[in-house]
Amino acid sequence: MMNIRVRRTATLVMLLLAALPAFARNAAAPQQPIAVQMYTLRNAGSLDQQLKIVHDAGVRAVETVGTQNVSAQALKQLLDRYAIKAVSSHVPLTELRNNLDGVVAFNRAIGNTTLVVPYLDQKDRPTDAAGWTALGQDLGRIARQLRGKGMQLAYHNHDFELADFEGRTGLELLFAAAGPELQTELDLAWVARAGLDPAAMLGKFSGRLFAVHAKDNAPKGQAEDEGGFAAVGQGVLDWNAILPAAAAANVKWYIVEHDQPRDPGKVIQTGADYLREHLTLSQPARARR
């Protein structure tokens, strides 16, 4: 009987030892810098269900939409449940101007240190070069305040910031006036919709790219029920040019987004899978570190 128990124990130990290398490889495998913008999942059930979709897609980072309509404690508990971290949060400009301390406190509680201006209401959109310069100065002031609190500020574009003012876009004027503290979150699909080259635009903001919104545009006349957007790699954007340009510009995060997805879970899975494959191929230097 003793010999049988010894043999069983030895066999179990050998099986465990054999499994350890594979487990260690999986545990040690670094997560690529891929996140999901939670706006994509706004119609995909409860917040718990939305985060489960992110987790099941193999993604471990999100960009939140404000407070996600829950307390900081509740949000942190849900993030921890799915081993997901918040890497940034979209916060309306009015909140940053009028409730900065409250915004900072909430985001500290969930472990996030990057706040992003997501959109400008019509009344806040400059109409000339001087207006974009003034807005940049205002955002630079807020960015410096946040830097003193251990946080950073970024700005997310649509297409209206890319109007031309005597050879420079509104976005370029804004960043020139803001100073180095302000980072950009470049939405690649909106850059393309403005008639500009996303790869070239990445080069203009090299060193100031907190993130890109990784999204795609469907061919003209297609996916009209989805706002004309497509899952990453399934549309018309030239990712073979974009991803090397993003790597050269030192993009920190690739945030999967789709404004009007018919199937949010599928869009996220498709986008994450595409980036996992192609980031490895386009960023050999990063992969070797």
Residue ranges of predicted features:
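Conserved, mostly hydrophobic/aromatic
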Residues: V36, V54, V62, L79, ...
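N-terminal pre-domain/capping segments
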Residues: F23-T114, G207, L281-R289
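Bacterial N-terminal signal peptides
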Residues: A10-P21
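A cross-domain feature marking catalytic cores of carbohydrate-active enzymes
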Residues: V36-T40, T64-G66, S88-L93, V117-Y119, ...
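Bacterial N-terminal signal peptides that target proteins for export
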Residues: M2-T11
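Active-site acidic/histidine proton-transfer and metal-coordination neighborhood
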Residues: L93-Q183, G265
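Acidic/histidine-rich catalytic cores of soluble enzymes
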Residues: G148-V236
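Acidic-and-aromatic substrate-binding clefts and catalytic sites of carbohydrate-active enzymes
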Residues: L41-S46, A61-A74, P92-L100, K123-P126, ...
